[in-house]
Amino acid sequence: MTQDEMKQAVARAAIEYVVPGEIIGVGTGSTANFFIDELGKIKDRIKGAVASSEATAQRLKSHGIAVFDLNEIDAMSVYIDGADEITAQGAMIKGGGAALTREKIVASVAKQFVCIADGSKLVDLLGNFPLPVEVIPMAQAVVARKLAALGGEPRLRLKDGKPLVTDNGCFIIDVLGLKIQDPAELEAQINNIVGVVTVGLFARRGADIALLGTAEGVKRLTF
């Protein structure tokens, strides 16, 4: 199977976690896009979705799926999203698509987090993928120095030669060179830096289930 075929397979498998008649949380990224396309096929079975980014909201709407503001609901049965890296314990790095803050907010409301990814995303140790940190623009340099003090190499994420601006009007610093032994501890440590909006470590609220695409089919992990 190609990488896209693996993503397609896990997107299909994730449909079984969709509760009929409810509002579900939907993530951002290439694998989440495959899931949205599958969700469009059963849109009449759900009430709608909460999107973790403007891009996801637009894709959901293009399929005729109602998009709800998170402030309109109290709870969701499930949040379905991809990951840039995931461990066998369900800790993840997310934020390659620059939607980490909204992803973390929506995931916090869901009773269950289902991660969908191709099998290459399963790792023994997080950190080979650069760790995204969303920051208030005026604090960019201050935060970068503190991230460097943690042993990483911070780089401001650019788009067309200018700082990428998130849906929240913030910047992203990608931290290279980290080998993350204790994801939950590092998540708390970085989140405590003044000027950080959030870090793309999902360890304190990690995945409950992972659907991983492999050459042999979809592998399911429960945490």
Curated annotation (Swiss-Prot):
What Gene Ontology terms describe what this protein does at the molecular function level?
ribose-5-phosphate isomerase activity
Q: Which domain of life is it from?
A: Bacteria
Please give the Pfam families that the UniProt record associates with this protein: Rib_5-P_isom_A
Enzyme class of the recorded protein, top EC level: isomerase
Q: Where is the active site?
A: E103 (proton acceptor)
Q: Which positions are annotated as binding substrate? A: T28, G29, S30, T31, D81, G82, A83, D84, K94, G95, G96, G97, K121
Which proteins does it associate with, and in what oligomeric form? Homodimer.
EC assignment: the record states: 5.3.1.6
Q: Which InterPro entries match?
A: NagB/RpiA_transferase-like, Ribose5P_isomerase_typA_subgr, Ribose5P_isomerase_type_A
Return one Gene Ontology term, BP aspect: pentose-phosphate shunt, non-oxidative branch
Q: What does this protein do?
A: Catalyzes the reversible conversion of ribose-5-phosphate to ribulose 5-phosphate.
Assigned keywords, A-Z: Isomerase
Which SUPFAM superfamilies does this chain map to? D-ribose-5-phosphate isomerase (RpiA), lid domain (SSF75445), NagB/RpiA/CoA transferase-like (SSF100950)
Per its record, the protein catalyses: aldehydo-D-ribose 5-phosphate = D-ribulose 5-phosphate
Q: Which GO terms describe its cellular component?
A: cytosol
Q: Which family does it belong to?
A: Belongs to the ribose 5-phosphate isomerase family.
Q: In which pathway does it act?
A: Carbohydrate degradation; pentose phosphate pathway; D-ribose 5-phosphate from D-ribulose 5-phosphate (non-oxidative stage): step 1/1
- Give the protein's recorded name: Ribose-5-phosphate isomerase A
Q: Does the keyword Isomerase apply?
A: yes
